[in-house]
Amino acid sequence: MPVGVPKVPFLNPNPDPEPDSVEEELDSMEEKATWVDLYNRLYRQRWLFLGKDLEEEVANNIVGLMIHLNIEDPFWTQTLYINCLGGLIIPGLALYDTIGFVEPDVKTICLGIAASMASVVLVGGTVTERCAFPNARVMIHQPRAKEFDDRFSDLNLEGHLFLQLRNCVTQIYIHRTNKPAWVIIADLERDTFMSATEARTYGIIDGVYAFEEEYEEWS
């Protein structure tokens, strides 16, 4: 039987008058604690997660959370943890644009893998705030289209749209990594896998976490 999402206590951050004793303080904390599911608790700390394929529902949920948290506190840095094999182009670009739209910095962290459109989201984080764990992997490649409709007019329209989207993704990598266009275009022609250190050298991330609190910055 599935265990489900665990619940954890959450205390209202608004301070109340200090209690007269330790016992009163403990009683007050127990009364005010609200039990919420684990992800809700993490969201309140501005820790967001992309752990599924990038489809409309997944992207819309994260976009909605980011905008809500931006309204609630426009100065509290948001952190997006990424372990994703990629997904659809349009939802991925929607998430990428939202990262640039919200007022607070958005730290993007790769754990596991950030492949395809997930690597676009990773590189879209605030510069100096994009990082990965030592054993993470990053993969970039050009967008791939599904089968087109047989009708010529639809084929022409969809082909034109696909070329626009492909150019958009290419320009994102060029702008965010500061790599020459010819390097990006050549690397997108195939599945290009990178270790965390290689992704840092490439310009997709800015640093690699080493051990717990230690953070190795690129210089």
Curated annotation (Swiss-Prot):
Family listed: Belongs to the peptidase S14 family.
SUPFAM superfamilies: ClpP/crotonase (SSF52096)
Function statement: Cleaves peptides in various proteins in a process that requires ATP hydrolysis. Has a chymotrypsin-like activity. Plays a major role in the degradation of misfolded proteins.
Any GO CC annotation of this UniProt entry: endopeptidase Clp complex
Protein name, per record: ATP-dependent Clp protease proteolytic subunit
Organism of this sequence: Pelargonium hortorum
Domain of life: Eukaryota
One Gene Ontology term from the biological process aspect of the record: protein quality control for misfolded or incompletely synthesized proteins
One MF term in the entry's GO annotations: ATP-dependent peptidase activity
Signal peptide: none
Subunit structure: Component of the chloroplastic Clp protease core complex.
Keyword Thylakoid found: no
HAMAP family: ClpP (MF_00444)
Gene that encodes the chain: clpP-A
Catalytic activity field: Hydrolysis of proteins to small peptides in the presence of ATP and magnesium. alpha-casein is the usual test substrate. In the absence of ATP, only oligopeptides shorter than five residues are hydrolyzed (such as succinyl-Leu-Tyr-|-NHMec, and Leu-Tyr-Leu-|-Tyr-Trp, in which cleavage of the -Tyr-|-Leu- and -Tyr-|-Trp bonds also occurs)
Entry EC number(s): 3.4.21.92
